[in-house]
């Protein structure tokens, strides 16, 4: 007597269990373009060979085989050591290894195609730079992007990034868009000032004092001082900047006030340091720290935290469980990124070390140091996070007039939540009691809070539909939204655009403002290294998700989920697709207003366009 257990596209694993006919298929993964279905496509025809009708444990007529399946997974899918630093466990054991290898194969197929595009584009751009006579000024960096990267980055870089690169407003608003995870508002009584700024300078810039701004809840900080003791690679340099921002009481704009380097002479720069382009250099130094933060932060949040919650579910829930099937869809190819990252990106001498200032061990250090905080599940809920940092609904300071990350993100979360609520209500027949009595669901929660070691997970028992809705909504936010704010196409289109966002500095941090060379070219990558930087970041982009309907808009449109979950699921998916389509149309239509601004910024930010970003953890 045998059961054929299909684990998300692997060859069948035949194991001896007490059943002769029970077949399990985790069929929700998008291993090909048919895994997502546009609204116009017919999904009511012939069922796939391994059609699964997803059922709760209490509704399954073959509980013996279901229990045997879970026992098999617990014996062969283990908690292995973390990869890319000390974060969450990574799948181990025979089944864990097989799942990861399967995901790596899928990931590498897309990566090879995208890399070839990037290399082809890079050759054309290098020729353009040669024809220009090199990159001989800051403005020349526009040549790096003009008429280039059309194959690998068809969406182009964010409009305004090249044209307005010297803008202080652009610099400050990037903290509220391209990397919103480092910023916090300083509480007037609970947070001390991170450093002092010359009184006369503050008065000239703000017409008030640092103390008054602090007391009014108008001061914000972005702190990368943790990088001060990081080892740098030979002939690469970086500061460890802490930046102060303020909400101007006159213009109501969010603006930069000062940047402190925290290394060497520990200079503090302000917008009044215009001689020798010192202030521009200070912004470049901060952006260099910030680009490192965004790229490595995203290893822990969302990758590591989403993986461990899903791994706990795999070990405790049947593949026939509708909740696990939904998570399987969200975690498409997820277990490729960390092992491949170790092998080709963060390895000694690998792509990261070829471009960034820090070696592999500093990457691992950042992940290990940050994960106890970034890996907290409930603290990472979108609204919980931004409120904890005083960026939304702070009772000790005025509201930010624009917060593009939250404006876009909260709309997506609400659409996701509406779908998930419909799914949970239909699955549990609108009964909290059924949620509480779902043995596999409760086992998952106990596993996450126990052996899996998930920090700050929902405590058990998980006894209401609404709490389950929040967990699944956050899972979808992590894989289909939060990831793409920091990675995917965002670095090549905004957070890594040169000359303001180099992956490394190529001259030492100044020990005196008088020593800065005004053209700043010595601090920036050479023409070839600039092409290398853009090439690397372009390889993170995934434009093919648009024609294959693997975008966020089609997150829940896997044929097997549509067929295996009933009519209520199909109707909810149709509403989801329409709502995300409307948001996508609005994001694509963004233009500058009569002040040259979009969402209060002098560049157009489209990182959370649900019609353009993957529904999954792509890179």
From Swiss-Prot:
Listed EC numbers: 1.13.11.-, 1.13.11.45, 1.13.11.58
Give the note describing cofactor binding and stoichiometry.
Answer: Three His residues, the carboxyl oxygen of the C-terminal Ile or Val residue, and a fifth residue, usually Asn, ligate the metal, which binds water to form a catalytic base Mn(2+)OH(2) for hydrogen abstraction.
Q: Name one GO cellular component term.
A: extracellular region
- Its transmembrane ranges are none
Where does this one sit in the cell? Secreted
Predominant location: secreted
SUPFAM superfamilies hit by this protein: Lipoxigenase
Sorted alphabetically, which Gene3D superfamilies does this protein's record hold? Answer: 3.10.450.60, Lipoxygenase-1, Domain 5
Q: Which UniProt keywords apply?
A: Dioxygenase, Glycoprotein, Manganese, Metal-binding, Oxidoreductase, Secreted, Signal
Q: Which PROSITE patterns match?
A: LIPOXYGENASE_3
What are the protein's GO molecular function terms? linoleate 11-lipoxygenase activity; linoleate 9S-lipoxygenase activity; metal ion binding
Which residues of this chain are annotated as glycosylation sites?
32, 42, 62, 86, 164, 229, 515, 549
Q: Which residues bind Mn(2+)?
A: 298, 303, 483, 487, 619
| InterPro entries linked | LipOase, LipOase_C, LipOase_C_sf
Look at the named UniProt entry and state the broad enzyme category this protein falls under: oxidoreductase
Q: Which chemical reaction does it catalyze?
A: (9Z,12Z)-octadecadienoate + O2 = (9S)-hydroperoxy-(10E,12Z)-octadecadienoate; (9Z,12Z)-octadecadienoate + O2 = (11S)-hydroperoxy-(9Z,12Z)-octadecadienoate; (9Z,12Z)-octadecadienoate + O2 = (13R)-hydroperoxy-(9Z,11E)-octadecadienoate; (9Z,12Z,15Z)-octadecatrienoate + O2 = (9S)-hydroperoxy-(10E,12Z,15Z)-octadecatrienoate
Q: Which cofactor does it need?
A: Mn(2+)
Pfam families, alphabetized:
Lipoxygenase (PF00305)
Q: Please, one GO biological process term?
A: linoleic acid metabolic process
Signal peptide region: 1-16
Described function: Lipoxygenase that metabolizes linoleic and alpha-linolenic acids to 9S-, 11- and 13R-hydroperoxy fatty acids. At the end of lipoxygenation, the intermediate product 11S-HPODE from linoleic acid is then transformed into 9S-HPODE and 13R-HPODE as the final products. The intermediate product 11R-HPOTrE from alpha-linolenic acid is transformed into 9S-HPOTrE and 13R-HPOTrE as the final products. 9S-HPOTrE is further oxidized by the enzyme to 9S,16S-DiHPOTrE as the end product.
The molecule here is called Manganese lipoxygenase
Q: Which organism is it from?
A: Pyricularia oryzae (strain 70-15 / ATCC MYA-4617 / FGSC 8958)
